[in-house]
Amino acid sequence: MTFLLLLVSVCMMATGEERTKRDVCELPFEEGPCFAAIRVYAYNAETGDCEQLTYGGCEGNGNRFATLEDCDNACARY
């Protein structure tokens, strides 16, 4: 019984983490209110591609990746 409970808990955590990754990819890109002009990549859910954009350096959301590879790895469609 304890093993079953542990197994279910692990599965729920893994599913929740995967859902969170997809949720981040569905967010619109937010450049934030600052003016740092940092080149980043964000996933565009409408086109299904990662795009290079300019991030202001503060606030924004999780749809922001340092490299194209990071963006592709996080947001590749299944």
UniProtKB/Swiss-Prot annotation:
A matching Pfam family: Kunitz_BPTI
Q: Which PANTHER family match?
A: BPTI_KUNITZ INHIBITOR DOMAIN-CONTAINING PROTEIN (PTHR10083:SF374), KUNITZ-TYPE PROTEASE INHIBITOR-RELATED (PTHR10083)
For this chain, the family text in UniProt reads: Belongs to the venom Kunitz-type family.
Disulfide partners? 25-75, 34-58, 50-71
What does the record list as coiled-coil region(s)? none
Domain notes per entry: The cysteine framework is IX (C-C-C-C-C-C).
Instruction: Please tell me in which tissues this protein is expressed.
Output: Expressed by the venom duct.
Domain of life assignment: Eukaryota
* Keyword hit for Ribosomal protein: no
Keywords in alphabetical order, please. Disulfide bond, Protease inhibitor, Secreted, Serine protease inhibitor, Signal, Toxin
Q: Which GO terms describe its cellular component?
A: extracellular region
Its name, as the record gives it, is Kunitz-type serine protease inhibitor conotoxin Cal9.1a
> Which residues form the pro-region?
17-20
**InterPro entries noted in UniProt:** Kunitz_BPTI, Kunitz_BPTI_sf, TFPI/VKTCI-like
- Where it mainly occurs, coarsely classed, is secreted
| Lineage, broadest ranks | Eukaryota, Metazoa, Spiralia, Lophotrochozoa, Mollusca
Q: Which GO terms describe its molecular function?
A: serine-type endopeptidase inhibitor activity; toxin activity
Query: Signal peptide: which range, if any?
Result: 1-16
Compartment(s) of residence: Secreted
**Which residues bear the site annotation Reactive bond for chymotrypsin?**
35-36
Stretches assigned to the BPTI/Kunitz inhibitor domain: 25-75
